[in-house]
Structures are given as C-alpha cells and as structure tokens.
C-alpha cells in the first residue's frame, strides 16, 4: 500500500491542489457579487443564485484547467527529477504564480465592472495601450480598495499553506512502475482536461464561449457573475469578433426592412451651419435633474444646474440611450453612427475598415474640422479614430500647453488630462480662430476616475452621494462657463450644438442599474433661436450623425446605423445596444432581449425595473405580442446582419 500510494501521489496531489482553486474562484465570485451587489440585487433569489453559481463551475473548470496546463504537465509527466525537493518547490512556485495572477485579475475586475457591466476581455489591452498613467491608476485603486489587497494576500497565503506536495520516497520506488503509473495518470487525466476546457464530453458540445453564460441567467448583466475574468480573457484571444448570421438569404428583403444607407430627405439647399459636438465623460442621464422630473417622487434635483438651464432652451427626448459602455464605444457611435456590437470595433482588425463620419462628410462640403481631447496625443486611441473619420486637426494636452493664452501643464489633473474648465475655454477660443463653417468635437475628461476635482473647488463641491457627484457638479460648471463664453463669439448663433455622454457611470438609483438603465445617456440638441421641445421619442447616440445631416439638409447619400430622429415619426424611433451576448432592442414601448438565436425576454418600458418578462405572459403573447414580437425580431435581425456583413466586408461608408 505504501508503494502504491507513492506511485499515485503526484496524481492525488495534483487533483487536491486543483480542487483548492475552485474555492478560490468561488470566493472571488462572491466578492464580485458583494462589491457590485446593487447591480445584481434585482430578482436575486437563493435558488437563482445557486443556479448561477452552478453555471459558474463550468467556466471556472475551463479557466482553471487552461491556466494550469503547465502545472499539470509538470506534476504528471514522468520525470525522475520529481522526487527532488527543488522540483516541487518549482511546481509550487508556478502554481502560486499562475493562480495568484488569476485571483488578482478576478478581484480587479470586481472594481472595473461598474464601468462596463461585463467581464473584461482582451480588448482592454488595446484600449489602454497608449496610456502612460496606468501605474498611477492602479496605485490609486489599490489604496481605495485596500481591503481587496488584504483578501488577496490572505487567499494566496492560504493556497501556500494548503498546497500539497507529493510524498515520494525514491528508496522504495520501482522506477518502471512509477513511470508507467505517471504516464497512465497523464493519459487518464488528458481527456478530462480537454472536456473541462470545452465544457463537456459530448461530441456535439462546442467549446464554451462567453455567450454560453446566458443560459444560466435571467438578465444580461448577470452573465458577468457566471463568468470569470481569466476565462473571458483567454476565450477572446485571436477570436473572430464579427460573424455574419444567416437571418436573411434575400439581401433585398433585408434592405427593405432596414438599411444604414441614407438618402437626402429633401431638395432644400444645404444650410452650412457650424456643428459642435460635446462628448462629456460619464455624464449619464441619471445625473441631470431636468431629465428626471419624476425621480424620487419629483423631489430629485440632480447635479447639473447649468445643463438643466441648457435643456430649457434645447430639444431633448423622453428616452435616450448610449450604444456602448466604454469611451471607445462612444466615439464611433456619436461621430460615425456605428454602435458597439460584441466588441469595440476600433479595437479589432475591423479598425482598418474605411469609415465615414460627421467630420469627413462635412469636410467634403468645405467645412474645417477639428477634434479636441485634453489628454496626451494617442490617449485611448482617440487621435487615430479622429483621423480615420476625417478630422483634419487634433488638439490635445500638448497643444493646450503650447498656447500662451492658457495655464499650460499647471492645469493638468495629474492623471488623465487638462481639467475641463480651462480646456473647454481653450476649445471655445480655438473655434474662434477657425474659419466658418466648421465642425468640431470635444471629449471632456474630469468626470472620470480617480474622481478628483481642482483643489480650489473642493469646498464648493464637497463630497455628496456617490464619489462621482462632485465631479459631475464640476464638469457641469465647466460646461456652463463654456456656453457663456461661446455665446459671446460671432459664430455662436450660426451653430448647432449637440451634447451627449460617451457612456454612463456609477449609479445610486435602481432604474439606472437595470440592463437598459445602464445605457441611459442624454441627447441634447441646442440650436440658438430654435424653440425648445421635449419630443416623445426614443433617441440614441447613433442618431446624432443622421439628425445633424437632416438639420443641415445634407445633399448626398451617407452611411449611419441610426436615424434622423427629428424627421422620424415617434413610433418608428428605436435604440439598440449590446450587453454580455444579448442585443437589446427598444421600440414600440418595449425592450426586447435577443441572444442572436432567440428572444430571451421582453419588457414594457413602463416596467422601469424590468421585473416582468412578458415572454412568460401567455395572454400578452397571444394578444399584443403576437404582432409585436415577430416584427421586433425581424427588424433587429436585419440590423445585426447589416452590421456584421458591413464590418466583415469593409462597407461602412
């Protein structure tokens, strides 16, 4: 028995150590849940939580086995070095390093989730590849979440203490039996490893992907809880992001249902007004009092008195949405009319596609175009995107520093960019230097991590509510001063202003933490001299390009996935976004959730907390849903197929 135990000891120790990792992944998932509990709390029962935890085991198994292949091979491959202490110290070191890193990634992503509402994928490396401040960001978050660091240290220490080393005594080993036993162990384990990585033994089982998490969830946001970050990272390495579905074999039928190619709406001569697009970092609809008249039983005032004043003079919409959850999603949506499906296309090989946008369209009509962002050149890939879509000039931190009219790098926030207040004044001044007509866009930065404001404003805008609110107040003040300065310029009355956010951010209201609420962004159109109006329509970021083209009476065909919302009947306005493998399509007073093959849920927009899935309501399906459901599916499928075909065929202009 002693000899038999020695021979099988490497296998027993390997299995034991791998089982420890399930505990590590389980604890990391519970921490992920607790850190972001408000996003998962709705409808979370004990039985549903158990269902998601059970589903999580499938993805944990895959991640554990993929990341530990080197360790498994080293432990089970027949090497006579394995009876030596240094060899097992090496194996233990590899085990702790690999799995310590996996744990750290999971814990870090628990903090990052609230910004994206999903698990991190490999596109994060492209997204932040040009940032030189990642060390400072990491240090700031480490200090802010020091308790996660303590948990990390304790868990790695626990792995170290509980780690089991094979008990081998070379004096009692029969080497040929030992070699045979280890080879057989490796051969026996191999199919289980392959099956665990794939997600099952059956030959019909395709290797599991991120989208498989949706079979365990009731809401798209919950997929992040079922998944783990190491799995999400390795499953998106080198993968084809855009796959063309076969919903429509007849292209003409698809074109009749939906086309992103727009024809001129009328023959009115083009009005060459200036166009100014303000993309305000993380400036979600939730923070704006004027867009939340019924929130908190009508008592809510928000944090944006200056934007509230602007709204009183502008065109807004009863429902408005962003088309992604990251800054790099917002840029193509707002400036080129291209939403984010699956991954930000500008972080994929499709970034080499030829893309049009507001800038290129208007440059062709004699406009001078410029993009402004107060960070260093190259930050977030904005400069590359701006150039590819037709912006003739780019002004960043370096250009601000070189302008003697302003404070130079003394106005740098120490982390990301020039503070919003001075940079927006610079923006206004530079537009006064430009020849009309011009088209410009600015991307602000201060309402962003690490959520700090200039020292001189800390007593004016103290901490309140969530950490984001003081930053929103500061940026709102900066916007108010910008419009005051702009109103004194000769170009002001000949300008169309559009204000939106790149995406949403932290929330402290349940409505804005739902699958759809997390995409609620403002779309504000201000044209001096035009009567203000709240239109009972659905608007989205990708509508900005065609709406501006309609306001200008642009005379040529152009490309955008959105619509001219001002010249579209309310019943025909819609919005679309993508979250954790689910497409959300908003139209006709409902939101439909579609996983690419079938509809998972339908909610009435009046069901603000998305608590009543109408797919389970037989009466609704027989009555209202009998016509509505197939119509919405048909339209959404046409949008998806048009998107995927054009991405893969380079037909985005």
Name these PLM-found stretches.
Residues 201-560, 567-573, 577-579:
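Soluble catalytic regions of membrane-associated enzymes that act on cell-envelope
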